[in-house]
Amino acid sequence: MGIASHSAFRERESSPTGASLDASPRPWDKGLSGREPPRHVQVRPRSAVLNMLRRLDRIRFRGHKREDLLDLAESPNASDTECGDEIPLKTPRPSPRDSEELRDPAGPGTLIMAAGVQDFNRTEFDRLNEIKGHLEIALLEKHFLQEELRKLREETNSEMLRQELDRERQRRIELEQKMQEVLKARSEEQPAQPQQPPKGQSQASNGTGTERRSQGLASRVQKWFYERFGEYIEDFRFQPEENTVETEEPLSARRLTENMRRLKRGAKPVTNFVKNLSALSDWYSIYTSAIAFTVYMNAVWHGWAIPMFLFLAILRLSLNYLIARGWRIQWSIVPEVSEAVEPAKEDLTVSEKFQLVLDVAQKAQNLFGKMADILEKIKNLFMWVQPETTQKLYVALWAAFLASCFFPYRLVGLAVGLYAGIKFFLIDFIFKRCPRLRAKYDTPYIIWRSLPTDPQLKERAGATVSRRLQTASSRSYVSSAPAGLSKDEDAGRFHSTKKGNFHEIFNLTENERPLAVCENGWRCCLINRDRKMPTDYIRNGVLYVTENYLCFESSKSGSSKRNKVIKLMDITDIQKYKVLSVLPGSGMGIAVSTPSTQKPLVFGAMVHRDEAFETIFSQYVKITSAAASGGDS
């Protein structure tokens, strides 16, 4: 009984529709039990579980088609049950007799019901595990899709695309409005034309035909004109300029060095051209300069100067074309010196980076300083900062203007060309070999050297103010001095140092006194690189300038042996000096070279270095020019 019932239950469970299989009464079953065969029990599945399975199935296959999924052979085993669950199960209601047997615990169907419930619970547990797995898969897919969406938004930069889309929409709206305005204007122009009433049927037909032909001809002409010249007319349409903000690169030592090298390579053709011109003027190669001078003067005399320069430009471009094609053409008056290119290091230490930045900054500072000096001199020349210099240019321009008005251009061009050739090839050569002659008679050189820069103007203004203050203080001191003192005693007291009178300390004559600019001197330190002892190598003190001497008073020793007196006539070279090259800036020192010293004497740590240099240099030029004029006379 139990075995037959269990096999019948399994057959019912394996049926495709899920309905119960009611077997006909068998005689052997009746003989075994002594009564009619029992009816099978069908457990009704829960509707909540089926609804949950349907929802999970929709979640799992959301966004995908059935054809995109794996085949049944590669899909999990639970797919068959899921597909079977989509068909609603219709089970017949059990009869009252079956319900009585279910309620009877001692009945023969108890074991069958227990086995069926156990199998059903097992299948429900498997389905719950499967549901749990589907939920985990869905959550993981959701997480991965969110990550991909976030990365996709970051890569495509949706904000910028949205802004660009808004701009395009706005532009489209504006174009539509313009098109509507144009169409409206055309529609208003057409009915505005006067229409004459027809006098007759033939006249009306002829008039309409003529109007149609004229309108067709006008439209064709307009279409042809728009096709030919519409593109050019559109080019002249004014459009608002878009302000684009350029992103600035951060400061980088490697980038700064590379930019300086690029600037040097870019300026190399210009510097080579200037060097070749200077070599022609200096007659570096006698044959080349002689040929160039002869060709130039003949071209100017016959009026071929402009064609000659144009031919030289064409020749230069032709040579550049051949060089670009691979030809090795090297021609230069001055031999080129190949500079060793240091290989770029990948890893630099902190000290190397710092030194690299300092070197590049120093080169950039010097380059910018030279460019600023040139531009400031040109600006001061045209702004009448130095009237006597600008007046010469003013007179020269008036003379050139009057000459161009009264003389023919051929004669003016001939005069200018001949003067330029003689000046470039002959006069400049003589002036470069004779500096004193150039300082007296080379007018362009004198004008350019005398033009001041803005820092020099500020220094002169500051020196004038300080001189006025010192003059006022000296007048007040003299007026407050005792009446018994003579003028010489007052002057000697005023020009005395901390250790005594000025001329006694430096063993000079009484008329040697500091200039008005440096009456109190400049605090500095004397660096004598000829000495080896540290006490003699660096001395602290005060520097004075007289009419004929440069005097240094040491502040440590009372002996006058440690003081330094240099005659201005003995100075061979004087220039600004930078004691520590590591520090930024142009330095705070002055280097003075004399025949008695192997290495220049350096006066360092001077706060007013530029003022002291200008004073010493101007007094030196004054003394040397006076001596030269005295020797010539």
From Swiss-Prot:
Domain GRAM span(s) in chain numbering: 500-578
Keywords: Apoptosis, Coiled coil, Endoplasmic reticulum, Membrane, Mitochondrion, Phosphoprotein, Transmembrane, Transmembrane helix
Stretches with biased composition (Low complexity): 190-205
Ranges of Basic and acidic residues composition bias in the record: 27-39, 95-104
Gene Ontology annotations for the cellular component aspect, listed alphabetically: endoplasmic reticulum membrane; mitochondrial membrane
Transmembrane intervals: 295-315, 389-409, 411-431
Quaternary state and interactors: Interacts with RTN4 (isoform B).
Name of the protein this chain belongs to: GRAM domain-containing protein 4
Gene behind this protein: Gramd4
